[in-house]
From Swiss-Prot:
The keyword GTP-binding belongs to this UniProt entry's keyword annotation: yes
Organism ancestry: Eukaryota, Fungi, Dikarya, Ascomycota, Saccharomycotina
Any one Gene Ontology molecular-function term assigned to this protein's record: GTPase activity
Protein name: GTP-binding protein RHO1
Organism: Eremothecium gossypii (strain ATCC 10895 / CBS 109.51 / FGSC 9923 / NRRL Y-1056)
Record CDD domains: RhoA_like (cd01870)
Topology class, membrane: Lipid-anchor
Superkingdom: Eukaryota
Chain positions listed as propeptide in the UniProt record: 205-207
Residues carrying lipid (S-geranylgeranyl cysteine): C204
Compositionally biased residues, Basic residues: 190-207
Stretches the record annotates as Disordered: 187-207
Binding site for GTP: 18-25, 65-69, 123-126
Length: 207
């Protein structure tokens, strides 16, 4: 009994969503396996499990990857039930992927995961200052997403945090999942304090 109290088993479920090719799977693989995949393979359905320690607590974090392509719009909701935190990802070098956070992803997440903490994640931060990326976007009348633009979207969708990362360089990767773990642990209490009129149940509900 004392051993159980000293090191309790805490399990949480994280679901990651966002446009296809925005960097979701690479982010998960680098965090869970420590290596960056060199070839892009569209995700159909993948799960990983990682141990995360935050604030002296060890958490077994189940990482649920999802496919962003429209072909999987009917399959993806199977990932949502019982989630404790959701990462909505976009790619910093693809402004349209941030626009889709507002136009597609937030409504889907709110529908299937009412009350679950959301973190907005800017992937591929290493490409923001890449000359080739900047030139390609300039030719389309666009530019890489700025931190201010992304933070504004994070505020609009009610995200508990906005974090940038680069799976390729490793920048911010651990910070993303530590923040997600904290959000999954504090979600119920934090949400209920902020909005006492909300229901206490904070897990996903498939309607």
């Amino acid at each position: 009994m004392s051993q159980q109290m000293h090191n309790p088993s805490i399990r949480r479920k994280l679901v990651i969503v966002g446009d296809g090719a925005c960097g979701k799977t690479c982010l998960l693989i680098v965090f869970a396996k420590g290596k960056f995949p060199q070839v892009y393979v569209p995700t159909v359905f993948d799960n990983y499990v990682a141990d995360v320690e935050v604030d002296g607590r060890r958490v077994e974090l189940a990482l649920w990857d999802t496919a962003g392509q429209e072909d999987y719009d009917r399959l993806r909701p199977l990932s949502y039930p019982d989630s404790n935190v959701v990462l909505i990802c976009y790619s910093i070098d693809l402004p349209d992927s941030l626009e889709n956070v507002m136009e597609k992803w937030i409504s889907e997440v709110l529908y299937f995961c009412q009350g679950v903490p959301i973190i907005l994640v800017g992937c591929k931060a290493d490409l923001r200052n890449d000359p080739q990326v900047i030139e390609q976007l300039r030719q389309q009348g666009q530019q890489p997403v700025s931190q201010a633009q992304a933070q504004e979207v994070a505020d609009q969708i009610g995200a508990v945090e906005y974090i940038e990362c680069s799976a390729k360089t490793g920048f911010g990767v651990r910070e993303v999942f530590e923040a997600a773990t904290r959000a999954s642990l504090m979600g119920k209490q934090g949400k209920s304090k902020a909005k006492s009129d909300k229901k206490k149940k904070k897990k996903c509900v498939v309607l």
